[in-house]
């Protein structure tokens, strides 16, 4: 079960603020960094863009500083299972989800529930965090699929281009082009444009 220790949605600290926990925080820390940050990971300085995510494991050193403005949403929690292993996304590594607004919305809902006195609060928080992690995992998996599809299409279009250049005398109608790459007209226009 995931147990939430603390969370904050849309948290602003002072400009250039630094977080430095050399021994980690003793729990998992999930960050949605809404502004660029300087992060030190395994003795390497990385400057993030906005909407970077990071899942720190419990004993991993946490050292990050705002490039200027400091804004993030975050969760401190413990879990019986490693969320990264369970849901297949990176830990102690920066990644950029394509759905940062959705993640932020989850964190907002989690914080609202955290401060409520409603029945089954802890169970509901567990479900919300699990749902957020599933959403992140699906996003990263589908992005990998889309990248692979894009690479395959690129090769198909490169081969088609070579075929057209090698056979300039032939008539190359849109129907034939679609047939060569096995796409419908509408799909062809989307990818070719």
What does each model-identified segment do?
Residues 170-193:
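Basic/polar phosphate-binding segments, predominantly the helix-turn-helix DNA-binding elements
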Residues 41, 93, 115, 167, ...:
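Short, flexible active-site loop motifs that bind/organize anionic cofactors or intermediates
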Residues 73-80, 100-148, 152-166, 189:
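An amphipathic alpha-helical interaction segment
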Residues 17-19, 89-93, 114-118, 146, ...:
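A short, mixed-charge helix-start or loop-turn motif at secondary-structure junctions
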Residues 1-4, 23-28, 106, 125, ...:
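Short acidic/polar alpha-helix capping motifs at helix-coil junctions
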Residues 86-108:
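Aromatic/histidine-rich interaction motifs
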Residues 2-93, 122:
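N-terminal regulatory/effector-sensing and dimerization cores
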């Amino acid at each position: 079960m995931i147990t939430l220790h603390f969370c904050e949605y849309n948290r602003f600290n002072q400009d250039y603020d630094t977080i430095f926990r050399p021994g980690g925080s003793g729990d998992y820390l999930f960050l949605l960094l809404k502004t660029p940050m300087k992060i030190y990971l395994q003795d390497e300085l990385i400057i993030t863009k906005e909407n970077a995510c990071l899942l720190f494991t419990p004993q991993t050193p946490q050292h990050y500083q705002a490039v200027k403005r400091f804004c993030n949403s975050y969760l401190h929690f413990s879990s019986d299972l490693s969320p990264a292993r369970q849901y297949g996304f990176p830990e102690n590594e920066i990644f950029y989800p394509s759905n940062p607004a959705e993640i932020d919305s989850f964190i907002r809902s989690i914080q609202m529930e955290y401060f409520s006195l409603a029945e089954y609060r802890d169970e509901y928080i567990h479900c919300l965090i699990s749902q957020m992690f599933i959403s992140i995992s699906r996003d990263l998996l589908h992005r990998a699929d889309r990248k692979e599809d894009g690479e395959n299409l690129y090769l198909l279009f490169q081969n088609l281009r070579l075929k057209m250049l090698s056979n300039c005398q032939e008539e190359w109608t849109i129907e034939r082009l679609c047939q060569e790459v096995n796409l419908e007209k509408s799909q062809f226009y989307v990818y070719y444009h």
